[in-house]
């Protein structure tokens, strides 16, 4: 696997020197300063590449070229945004970049309710609390029809949770959910958020699939023509939220995506933390089934809680993800490719490290502090080395 590191650009508190010292050789980044829907010019791409090259690093994966909301709803200037997306892909390929991660989550990117969940050892993790989220939906956002998505017991618990909240806690929970986490390109006020949700009235899972199918039928031929691998990121969490459909959550969704445009360039990001939140997602079986389509991996572990819809980020080698089995499955696919003549390594990045040690005293991007990811990368690197020595001695 190619060891990579997500970097949010020049304003990231983690420097490129830090990235090199962590042992990563590739960087996963994006041009966050370019508005959604606009073309990424060759000049801007080359500028970012040069910045990385100065530190001896390569731009291994784009994460992400954002998919404009109008593409997802098929409204407004959606076709122009698709045309711009295609041009961005061509420009990236012309600059030698061959892997692009993207997602098709409506309105929100990845979602958490607590960005400072304290673990027993004093480190901090990200958490999604189903009851806190219900309290937000039912009593802060007051989304029409939200009660239908929660059991009577969850509604009772959510009311108690909300009643115990002070004004500052309401503000913090709201910001955690709608203000935009790292990598999300848009944040909202409550009124803006309600308006954005309303744009999806009448859009169910089947309709969103139709919209994604149109998008893929437009962009995959372009990616194929210029040798650029697309890797869709799963929904996080992997289920419908806020009354919105989600269509990249299960093995059935992956099969649909594979078939809708049957090209190896129409591929997946295997995010073990996102898919792994669902107990019915067999990660190893998914890797084995869709191995030739897996172009990028996010390796992390989550811990499901008493309410199975609640979870927090675990240590990389703990939690509900069998990291040994996952890494072995990825290396099996990598070995298969090498035997077929494809010597490219599958890019991997350690995802969502705990905030720990000296980073507890620093301003960090939630989930993306340096030391927690350094620890995760070192642990996964060790697992990879051991598996290679025992099972794949021919691999470098």
Curated annotation (Swiss-Prot):
- InterPro entries noted in UniProt: Man_deHydtase, Xyl_isomerase-like_sf
The protein's superkingdom reads Bacteria
Instruction: Write the Enzyme Commission number(s) for this entry.
Output: 4.2.1.8
Task: Give a GO biological-process term.
Answer: D-glucuronate catabolic process
Biological pathway: Carbohydrate metabolism; pentose and glucuronate interconversion
Q: Which UniProt keywords apply?
A: Iron, Lyase, Manganese
| Entry-linked PANTHER family | MANNONATE DEHYDRATASE
Q: What is this protein called?
A: Mannonate dehydratase
């Amino acid at each position: 696997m190619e060891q990579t590191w997500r970097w949010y650009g020049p304003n990231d508190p983690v420097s490129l020197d830090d990235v090199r010292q962590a042992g990563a050789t590739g960087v996963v980044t994006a041009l966050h300063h370019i508005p959604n829907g606009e073309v990424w010019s060759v000049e801007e791409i080359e500028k970012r590449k040069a910045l990385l090259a100065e530190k001896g690093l390569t731009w291994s994966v784009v994460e992400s070229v954002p998919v404009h909301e109008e593409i997802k709803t098929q409204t407004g200037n959606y076709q122009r945004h698709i045309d711009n997306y295609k041009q961005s892909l061509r420009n990236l390929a012309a600059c030698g970049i061959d892997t692009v991660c993207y997602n098709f989550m409506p309105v929100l990117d990845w979602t958490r309710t607590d960005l400072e969940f304290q673990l027993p050892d004093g480190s901090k993790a990200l958490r999604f609390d189903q009851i806190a989220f219900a309290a937000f939906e039912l009593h802060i956002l007051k989304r029409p029809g939200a009660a239908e998505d929660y059991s009577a017991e969850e509604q009772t618990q959510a009311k108690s949770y909300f009643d115990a909240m002070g004004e500052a806690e309401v503000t913090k929970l709201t910001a955690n959910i709608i203000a935009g986490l790292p990598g999300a390109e848009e944040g909202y006020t409550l009124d803006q958020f309600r308006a954005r949700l309303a744009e999806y009235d009448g859009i169910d899972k089947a309709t969103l699939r139709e919209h994604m199918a149109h998008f893929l039928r437009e962009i995959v031929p372009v990616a194929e023509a210029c040798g650029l691998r697309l890797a869709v990121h799963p929904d996080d969490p992997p289920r419908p939220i806020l009354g919105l459909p989600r269509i990249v959550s299960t093995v059935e969704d992956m099969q649909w995506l594979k078939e809708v445009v049957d090209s190896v360039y129409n591929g997946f990001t295997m995010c073990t933390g996102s898919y792994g939140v669902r107990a019915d997602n067999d990660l190893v079986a998914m890797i084995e089934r869709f191995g030739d389509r897996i172009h990028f991996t996010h390796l992390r572990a989550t811990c499901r809680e008493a309410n199975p819809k609640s979870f927090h980020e675990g240590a990389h080698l703990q939690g509900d993800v069998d990291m040994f089995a996952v890494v072995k499955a990825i290396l099996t696919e990598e070995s298969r490719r090498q035997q077929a003549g494809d010597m490219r390594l599958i890019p991997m990045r350690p995802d969502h490290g705990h905030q720990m040690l000296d980073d507890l005293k620093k301003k960090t991007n939630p989930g993306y502090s340096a030391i927690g990811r350094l620890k995760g990368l070192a642990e996964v690197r060790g697992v990879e080395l051991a598996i290679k020595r025992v099972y794949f001695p021919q691999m470098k």
